[in-house]
């Protein structure tokens, strides 16, 4: 799906995370993250990719997800919970939040405030958002932007 395309959106912005989108993130979290929470887990793709990449490609103790939830879980082990009901106690043993959030800006912007108030947060979404007026209110919360390049999010 392109940003300027007219494809019909998938309900609840459910687009599983492709491996290609996760690989560039790994060097930035190695040595800093041992556990993470995934509050928009969907089918668990992002979790599997992070655990696979850190367990198989790097000679380290792999990074593991110790809490996963979604408004509509699509895999076992993912709790049913709306991200906006996520509490600090739910993820107190997680080092960070890492998620591929919904594309809808009204949800994304609320999610940025909510997640960053709980834990350091890594979000996978379009990098050019940083250069829009709507990002102005959120820029002070950002520490780093990692570009993942062009990625095919919808197979076919």
Feature map (PLM): residue ranges:
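Class I S-adenosyl-L-methionine-dependent methyltransferase catalytic core
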Residues: 1-156
